Amino acid sequence: MAAAAAAAAALGVRLRDCCSRGAVLLLFFSLSPRPPAAAAWLLGLRPEDTAGGRVSLEGGTLRAAEGTSFLLRVYFQPGPPVPAAPVPAPSLAPGENGTGDWAPRLVFIEEPPGAGGAAPSAVPTRPPGPQRCREQSDWASDVEVLGPLRPGGVAGSALVQVRVRELRKGEAERGGAGGGGKLFSLCAWDGRAWHHHGAAGGFLLRVRPRLYGPGGDLLPPAWLRALGALLLLALSALFSGLRLSLLSLDPVELRVLRNSGSAAEQEQARRVQAVRGRGTHLLCTLLLGQAGANAALAGWLYASLPPGVGDPGEDSGEAGVHFPWLPALVCTGAVFLGAEICPYSVCSRHGLAIASHSVCLTRLLMAAAFPVCYPLGRLLDWALRQEISTFYTREKLLETLRAADPYSDLVKEELNIIQGALELRTKVVEEVLTPLGDCFMLRSDAVLDFATVSEILRSGYTRIPVYEGDQRHNIVDILFVKDLAFVDPDDCTPLLTVTRFYNRPLHCVFNDTRLDTVLEEFKKGKSHLAIVQRVNNEGEGDPFYEVMGIVTLEDIIEEIIKSEILDETDLYTDNRKKQRVPHRERRRHDFSLFKLSDSEIRVKISPQLLLATHRFMATEVEPFKSLYLSEKILLRLLKHPNVIQELKFDERNKKAPEHYLYQRNRPVDYFVLLLQGKVEVEVGKEGLRFENGAFTYYGVPAIMTSACSDNDVRKVGSLAGSSVFLNRSPSRCSGLNRSESPNRERSDFGGSNTQLYSSSNNLYTPDYSVHILSDVQFVKITRQQYQNALTACHMDSSPQSPDMEAFTDGDSTKAPTTRGTPQTPKDDPVLTLLSNRTSLPCSRSDGLRSPGEVVYLRMEEMAFPQEEMPNFEEHRSQQVSLSPVAVPTTAASDPECCNIHLDPEASPCSSDSEENMGKKLLRTLSGRKRKKSADGERASEENSNLTPLIT
């Protein structure tokens, strides 16, 4: 029977060796001498599962690792029937305490060390087995049998759940050093008595510590296993980082860095370039090292981490959950995070520095792997020929520059120039030429007179094609503007004479010529202008050359710099898209009337700005409209000195008084129109602020404040030693209604309904402040200047006036001798100086002047040109002397207008004069020719009821 037992044990070993990690099916029958009939029910046992290799049956002994839970199948022989009445038993034995528990039960008790096969003398003396089985204190706490026996599905077998607890630290070390762990024997309760099954029957359980691997081999401590895994992972990361940092550096890039990088980059590139030159050998070395490190890490983790994991609860009664793929999962995650992601994140940003500092280590690794990697590298070089480097074509280089734009220090203009230079070879002349219809050209039969030369100079071109006949396609010559240096326009030299003398060669290119070729031709100095032509083979006739346009050096430079070069003569920003230059038109205006001289104006403004100012005031500002002031007088007023002024803004003293054009509650007597700059307006007591810019105006009521009197006779002035007096008119204002008064409301003149006027001098008091925010240029017209302009305008529009003769010869002064006779106002031939068309009514809001106030017209300050008098041959030595004309005004009790007449007794005039004084004065100042008034006969009657106002 012993031979049979040994054979069965050998069979179990072979099954374990052949079916690793599989369930060991072993039926172990005790072949020892037959026990008494009461214990014959337990025949043998076997593990139902191996718990991932942690449970096995070796040499007749059941082996399990600590912390394992497994199912145990037991085989038994059914015993006699259970008695009906319980039999008294010791108090500590289950089933014998009077409870009637006759169910079979299994427990484990710990055996002393060496009991598994040591000599009897070496085993410590203990009580017999059955006696120990009865003592509950001797039952093993490290091995528990969970629950009662359950039916095993086969007659004569049952299943029971066994759990092996974790051994304590000292017990694990003693068990490991003593021969493979702690030993436990089995105690069985058959319902009547306890029976001990030990080594004799093969019912032993040996618990081994976890320091043993899945195959039972001894493993190092946990800290040593973790350290080994970290070292292998670091080695894999090292090979991965070297591969990324070294192989990502292209030889071309290293050469560029060595020649154009910084000092540190040049040194690093020099050190790496020697190793990177043997690319295939380096590649094989690094890949071999990384593959070996990854494989070693996987094997180490498989040996260190148990493949079976699980610890079901006490009442679950199921085997542990098995994860044989756990080492592979841990190895994959560690390699992915530690050996791929981290090295790539670092080496992709600092690859050159890492590669240069690890050159010595790389050389050592290449030398270690030389026997394997060098032949393989040579084989790859022979099979794949030369190593493929990163070479950029023109298109790839352009895209690289565009992609690197956010990270490079290239500005947009530099990038455009590089792009234009690289695209120069891909463009042809036809894409950049100027069509023939847009070219400025001259006929060959033209004459270089003043008009032609002026047109050439106004065009702004320096090279002008010359065509023959009526066909602009027939270009026969080129005219350079510098060829006209010795040409006098008064000589009317034929253009053909100049072109034949210089004989400039024509440079013709075809429409499909590349721009780089044309640029090379221009660089040779032949010409900077080429005629673009193409072969026209359309139709049935013979092919011929057709001129499409011209191309210049400027066109090619514009394509290189990717921008348009505009000069003062360009009308279009792009010859192809026909986009006009802003604020530049082809139409030419003659602004000679607005060309100013130094004596006329102190602040320099352009004629265009003067024209715009004149048009704006004449159409938008009520007091300066043609209804009240003629455009000619307005222009002379704008040319008057000190009318257009400039004011500089001081950043350091922003609140200086000189920075205010108007201050709230401070009287003023001038009007301001802003031409350039910005101002800030503060309105009312609330201090509301807003900004205004060019062509905003203020203070219109300041120049419109006036008063008149119809009771007093006022002295107008003297001309050539004679006085001119103004008489009152009994008639009242009837020409304009109050709704037509230029001093209306704030909406018309920028004033306010709450604005005040000084009672003493009728000055306008604004309720707002105007403060400049930058350098400004503005028009400033005082009330006196405006009144002078009104007087001149009224005198210009007066139909009749007494004539005068106030011109002297030499140094003598000749007083006038002819006077008129006084007449009544109704029959008086003396007419008013103002007409109904140019009269200005009074307003109650304007305020009235004091009786003693005198208004000086100061016509000598108006810059009027002198003209030749009608009898210039007789009076060429006489001059016109203008003196201030005093117009005293008096206050009126109501807002009535005054009618001002000339006193015939006080006015020096000729009895047979056909021209009034106002006409002659205005004609003398403005340069107009003498013209008789068609309405002279009806002037007195028509103006008898008009009461215009001069203030």
Swiss-Prot record:
SUPFAM superfamilies: CBS-domain pair. The keyword NAD does not apply. Keywords: CBS domain, Cell membrane, Ion transport, Membrane, Phosphoprotein, Repeat, Transmembrane, Transmembrane helix, Transport. The modification Phosphothreonine is found at residues 821, 824. One of its GO terms (cellular component) is plasma membrane. It is a multi-pass membrane protein. Residues 731-740, 814-824, 942-951 have a biased composition (Polar residues). It is found in: Cell membrane. Residues 920-932 have a biased composition (Basic residues). Gene3D superfamilies: CBS-domain. The keyword Phosphoprotein applies. Predominantly expressed in brain and testis, and, at lower levels, in kidney. In the brain, expressed in hippocampal neurons (at protein level). GO terms for biological process: magnesium ion homeostasis; monoatomic ion transport. The chain crosses the membrane at residues 23-43, 222-242, 282-302, 319-339. PANTHER family: METAL TRANSPORTER CNNM, METAL TRANSPORTER CNNM1. Shares weak sequence similarity with the cyclin family, explaining its name. However, it has no cyclin-like function in vivo. Probable metal transporter. This is Metal transporter CNNM1. The gene is Cnnm1.
